[in-house]
Amino acid sequence: YPGSTNHVVEIDPAVTQIAYEQLGLSPATTIKTFNMDARQFFIRGIPGEKYDIVIGDVFNGRSAPYHLTTREFDQLIEDSLSPKGVYLLNIIDDYRRGRYMPSIIYTLKQVFKNVHLFNVGRAWEDIRVSTYVVVATNYDFDFSAYKTPTLTPAGKLEPYGRIYDGDLDIYLADRKAVLLTDDYAPTDIFIAPVLARLKL
């Protein structure tokens, strides 16, 4: 999106330095980096700024910054979005056995009108740890025919799959999802079994 303005929030200045010095990111772009914690960024805010897309990519399967998973943080994001704005989260979990992702989804549903879950193909039918994308928005997007193909690690082209809303509600109930708040967010406990299965 060459005509867009992009704000990148990266807590580690060394990562920003590597992007410019080693990965060839030109300083002559519309990308502006803020070296600070993401929650502090949204608390301070930029006057008059509303985002069309916010991407959360801090959940790596090894650690869980709990303060970025709570209802209070989700509300900060919701307040920062444009009317058709979308919050995308990249999450690693075991769909069939994990409690981390269902609790994040359940918490998002307390703030956003629409929450959807996507994965490559139908990975939720397998018993394994996988990467998922959670989409939270107040706008009524039509995802019914969403089948954008993506290249798998094995080199196979597969469509993204979406778990239907009714099935998602059943999933949250079956997985005993909990509301994550600033006062109660046991994300490290939820992630521990994932770490054990990944043997990290």
Task: Outline where the language-model segments fall.
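Alpha-helical scaffold elements adjacent to nucleotide-binding pockets in ATP/GTP-utilizing enzyme cores
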Residues: 103-107, 132
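The AdoMet/dcAdoMet-binding core of the Class I SAM-like
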Residues: 1-88, 95-101, 109-111
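Soluble small-group transferase modules, centered on the S-adenosyl donor enzyme superfamily
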Residues: 114-200
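Non-catalytic surface loops within mature trypsin-like serine protease
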Residues: 13, 93, 138-140
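Short histidine/acidic/glycine/proline-rich micro-motifs that form metal-
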Residues: 93-96, 123
